[in-house]
């Protein structure tokens, strides 16, 4: 997605060979116009999947998930990382290791919001080692629902998360795929495009 790549190049900051900071538009301050475009792109890519629900994880996945849900006309449910006094029982639970925070979180979804007939699109801001997506898949599978696809805003293609998910037969659509963050420079994966005649 060209507009996203341009935003990453202009406002993203490479902190190391593994870490890209995009708090200027995605995971602290949110650019609503960009999020709207991201939502439209996810909806376009998954329009044939008959999605009934979008599942994400708090907090940075919520904005792109809501925008995609608006386009698809479905609801969003986000996995919580912290226990809530209002959500104590009847929860699906999974453990997820956070690459960025270097810690394991217990994530949960309420059983009353996801059902076995749901066709779920998982959306998240980043894909690195795949732990968040695998944890969300576990929650969906515990409900007996089906994962119709995974939408990722930014994939670190140099890490193995995308490979793990695709090897499981899951359709993964990433809007920006980063090949490298070496030497403080963002390099995107180059896809061959067929010549139109």
From Swiss-Prot:
Q: Which organism's genome codes for this protein?
A: Bacillus cytotoxicus (strain DSM 22905 / CIP 110041 / 391-98 / NVH 391-98)
Protein name as it appears in the record: Xanthine phosphoribosyltransferase
What subunit structure does UniProt give?
Homodimer.
As its record notes, the protein acts as a catalyst of: XMP + diphosphate = xanthine + 5-phospho-alpha-D-ribose 1-diphosphate
Gene Ontology BP terms: purine ribonucleoside salvage; xanthine metabolic process; XMP salvage
Stated EC number for the protein is: 2.4.2.22
Residues bound to 5-phospho-alpha-D-ribose 1-diphosphate: 128-132
Q: A GO CC term?
A: cytoplasm
Q: PANTHER family from the xrefs?
A: HYPOXANTHINE/GUANINE PHOSPHORIBOSYLTRANSFERASE, XANTHINE PHOSPHORIBOSYLTRANSFERASE
Summarizing the function annotation, the protein's role is:
Converts the preformed base xanthine, a product of nucleic acid breakdown, to xanthosine 5'-monophosphate (XMP), so it can be reused for RNA or DNA synthesis.
Tell me which InterPro entries the record gives: PRibTrfase_dom, PRTase-like, Pur/Pyrimidine_PRTase, Xanthine_PRibTrfase
UniProt keyword annotations, A-Z? Cytoplasm, Glycosyltransferase, Purine salvage, Transferase
């Amino acid at each position: 997605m060209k507009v996203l790549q341009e935003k990453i190049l202009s406002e993203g900051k490479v902190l190391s060979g593994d870490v890209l900071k995009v708090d200027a538009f995605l995971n602290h301050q949110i650019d609503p116009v960009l999020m709207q475009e991201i939502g439209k792109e996810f909806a376009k890519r998954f329009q044939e999947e008959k999605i009934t629900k979008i599942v994400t994880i708090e907090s940075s996945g919520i904005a792109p998930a809501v925008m995609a849900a608006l386009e698809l006309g479905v609801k969003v449910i986000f996995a919580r990382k912290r226990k809530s006094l209002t959500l104590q029982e009847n929860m699906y639970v999974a453990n997820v290791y956070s690459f960025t925070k270097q810690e394991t979180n217990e994530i949960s979804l309420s059983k009353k919001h996801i059902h076995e007939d749901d066709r779920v699109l998982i959306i998240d801001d980043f894909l690195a080692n795949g732990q968040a997506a695998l944890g969300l898949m576990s929650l969906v599978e515990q409900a007996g629902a089906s994962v119709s696809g995974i939408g990722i805003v930014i994939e670190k293609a140099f890490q193995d998360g995308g490979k793990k998910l695709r090897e499981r037969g899951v359709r993964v659509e990433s809007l920006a795929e980063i090949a490298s963050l070496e030497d403080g420079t963002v390099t995107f994966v180059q896809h061959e495009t067929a010549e139109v005649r």
